């Protein structure tokens, strides 16, 4: 399945460049309205002033499917250790995971327990085997697909982050660089 990643117009009001994935599709049309039959929910118009407007764009929600990977996942060891830490506090807490500027590579991971009532409406809430993870929208851009692991090894133990969005990580594994 191809996804449109960019739309450009030229000085000719009937010329549309549509970038799909990593390839460019350019087509010259003789009318001011362009429709994409395979994308029946999108109808694009080019007016005479070289402006591109979207008349309608409603995407049906994907059906809930079993077996989908969560946006952020926990290894079995991380889940056990976090559950133990949460139970020691004796409260109904969730884990907030995020990123902030800093660290050896430019961005560092943040993790802390917080009361579920503190979750904001725009936060992503991920239920993972009975454990709740909360992440703000900006951090989710950098953490989507990440797996949190835990090791109790004497050397190199603790939490580790396996982040598919990281282009570079520091030696300690607590900070990373990502291109957006």
Curated annotation (Swiss-Prot):
Where in or outside the cell it occurs: the entry states: Plastid, Chloroplast stroma
User: Entry's Pfam families?
Assistant: Fe-S_biosyn
Where is it mostly found?
A: plastid
GO BP annotations listed: iron-sulfur cluster assembly
Keywords annotated in UniProt: Chloroplast, Iron, Iron-sulfur, Metal-binding, Plastid, Transit peptide
Residues at which Fe cation binds = 104, 170, 172
What are its cofactors? Fe cation
PROSITE patterns found in the cross-reference section: HESB
Q: Tell me the SUPFAM superfamilies matching this sequence.
A: HesB-like domain
Transmembrane annotation, as ranges: none
Q: Where is the transit peptide?
A: 1-55
Q: Which InterPro entries match?
A: FeS_biogenesis, FeS_cluster_insertion, FeS_cluster_insertion_CS, HesB-like_dom_sf, ISCA_plant_cyanobact
Q: How is the cofactor bound?
A: Binds 2 iron ions per dimer. The dimer may bind additional iron ions.
The role this protein plays is:
Involved in the assembly of chloroplastic iron-sulfur proteins. Is able to transfer iron-sulfur clusters to apo-ferredoxin.
Database matches in NCBIfam families: iron-sulfur cluster assembly accessory protein
The record's subunit annotation is:
Homodimer; may form tetramers and higher multimers.
What is the protein named? Iron-sulfur assembly protein IscA, chloroplastic
Query: Whose protein is this, by species?
Result: Arabidopsis thaliana (Mouse-ear cress)
Gene name?
A: ISCA
């Amino acid at each position: 399945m191809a996804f449109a990643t960019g739309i450009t117009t030229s000085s000719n009001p009937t010329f549309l460049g549509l970038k799909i994935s990593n390839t460019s599709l350019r087509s010259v049309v003789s009318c001011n309205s362009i429709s994409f039959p395979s994308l029946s929910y999108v109808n694009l118009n080019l007016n005479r002033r070289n402006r591109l407007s979207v008349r309608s764009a409603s995407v049906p929600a994907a059906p809930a499917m079993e077996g989908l990977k969560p946006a952020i996942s926990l290894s079995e060891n991380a889940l056990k250790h976090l559950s133990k830490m949460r139970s020691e506090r004796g409260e109904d807490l969730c884990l907030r995971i995020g990123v902030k500027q800093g660290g050896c590579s430019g961005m560092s991971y943040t993790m802390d327990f917080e009361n579920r009532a503190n979750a904001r409406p725009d936060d992503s809430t991920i239920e993972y085997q009975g454990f709740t993870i909360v992440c703000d929208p900006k951090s989710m851009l950098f953490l989507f697909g990440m797996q949190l692991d835990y090791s109790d090894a004497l050397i190199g133990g603790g939490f580790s982050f396996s982040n598919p969005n990281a282009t570079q990580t520091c030696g300690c594994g607590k900070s990373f660089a990502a291109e957006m």
